[in-house]
């Protein structure tokens, strides 16, 4: 599973890293996580063409999308493919949700991988981080509600508008407003900016964050 940033890597495909690949034929089901370069290998064999999909639940401990009861993260269908495996290359011309989710996935994967002492040496964001993408908003935030931050209802309404009640019900940690934004570098950098706030939250804790978020 690869992606192309036309302005980076010489325009050549590179992996969608750590994402969950699911395939099934009727009730037969298997899944695997991609490696850094986008390769994956299913533990089960299929005799006919299975349906493939990406579920944006990353092996590095973050999920993209709503935390529903039965589905833990957003899912993008890839269609039927060969039983021996399906190759997919995602570009900015692909279905927009798939493109945005894949860029955010890579940004979060890279950020978390680089938090160690041998690289950036900063606090890793909390595990089970919940990231939401809003296509009709242009601002982003690190509300950290799934991890216990208490945000005043009026502040949520002011910032998130019509989405406020949804946010209070499903409790995201990071919200990304991607209205009018498409470039890989733009989506990537905005995601990393909010992840830096999540690292700050992991460092200072909930009580500080409840006050800090107002600013």
Stretches with model-predicted labels:
Residues 1-7, 38, 111:
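A short, amphipathic beta-strand motif
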Residues 15, 41-51:
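Short Pro-Gly-centered beta-turn/loop motif in secreted/extracellular proteins
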Residues 23-39:
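Short, acidic Ser/Thr/Gly-rich low-complexity loop/linker segments typical of extracellular
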Residues 142-205:
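Active-site scaffold of zinc-dependent metalloenzymes
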